[in-house]
Amino acid sequence: MKKKINAVRRSIMKSLTKNIGKSHAEGKLNQNFVVKRVLISRPNHRLGNILLLTPLVQEIEKTFPNAKIDLFVKGGITPIIFKNYKSVDKIFQLPKKPFSNLFQYIKGWFSLKSNKYDLAINATQGSSSGRLSISFAKADYKFFGEDVEDLKIQHSDYNHIAKNTIYNLRNYLSQIGLEDHRSQVPFLDLRLDKEELEDGKKKLHDLVKNDKKTICLFTNATGDKCYSESWWTAFYDKLESAFPDYNIIELLPVENISKLNFNIPNFYSKDVREMGGFIANCAIFIAADNGVMHLASASGTPTIGLFSVTNETMYKPYNHKSLSINTNNVDNDKVIELIKSSLN
């Protein structure tokens, strides 16, 4: 029932906002115009979607080094993710359940009118509420995130959800007179500090009690993205045989469940940054497509994303040595080969 209600809600929002917002490059920036305040809108509460904002924030930091960035989001995870981003100023947080917190929800939307921005950015072209929020905001320049057909030809990774908006934004900014730089799109980055990394190292050592490198598994995911217990058991058996010199452990989800029935050493935490510090000390992280897969990528660890139902082109991890594997097309032996290539 909840899924049906959400589907209806999205359909209504899409219809109401389909004609809202077109990015216009209304003349060139004059020489005295300085971008000091930027709004980025992503009204979503999911861990993965908020982590996928980190490359865009880094892009703004690089393009406008002295700008302050406000974020318009949903739920309470965003301040935790952006804890070490000094450029991030205000975070407007819509409640996850609007009808249970109607006053806070309305207040969140009206906060957009109480601030003036040089540039307002819709972080995801497909977000109806994102387009609506940018339309509602007070800004000199509004970027709604529309796709640019020519860019699809220029960039093989154009459809990746973290990269798409950056490519489109670079194109838009070049139209209003800013230099179009072609540097690599930033990686996801949790910006773990020294203490968090040291704490993660200690917790990992306390678990494995040796100095061998560690392979970390995350066996949970939502809905059809989740692989079965039998799949994980068969995969683990091959992994153990192929990597005898590695520790193999499991990071448990918030629900404290395991597709391996808790048969291997495991680590549990509800603290996203603690999890990130722990993962950062592992040699490689293997998971199906989910928010914790993006957390691993944002922690800097080579990440193997297992895909069977979702679009890997849009969601695959892309930091150093990370890769996605469509398990519909390869067997476990091939998966092991790809893991070896990443580790080497």
Show the residue positions of the predicted features.
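Donor-binding and catalytic core of enzymes assembling or modifying cell-surface/extracellular glycoconjugates
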Residues: 227-304, 308-309
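Conserved nucleotide-sugar phosphate-binding/catalytic loop shared by glycosyltransferases and other
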Residues: 71-102, 325
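Nucleotide-activated donor-dependent transferases that construct or modify glycoconjugates
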Residues: 23-46, 217
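Active-site donor-nucleotide binding/catalytic segment of nucleotide-sugar enzymes
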Residues: 37, 41-43, 187, 191-257, ...
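Conserved nucleotide-diphosphate donor binding/catalytic pocket of glycan-assembly enzymes
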Residues: 2-3, 92-189, 211-214, 218, ...
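Nucleotide-sugar donor-binding patch of glycosyltransferase catalytic domains
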Residues: 144, 266, 294-344
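Histidine-anchored nucleotide/phosphate-binding helix
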Residues: 49-64, 236
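Leloir-type glycosyltransferase catalytic cores
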Residues: 4-21, 155-203, 319-344
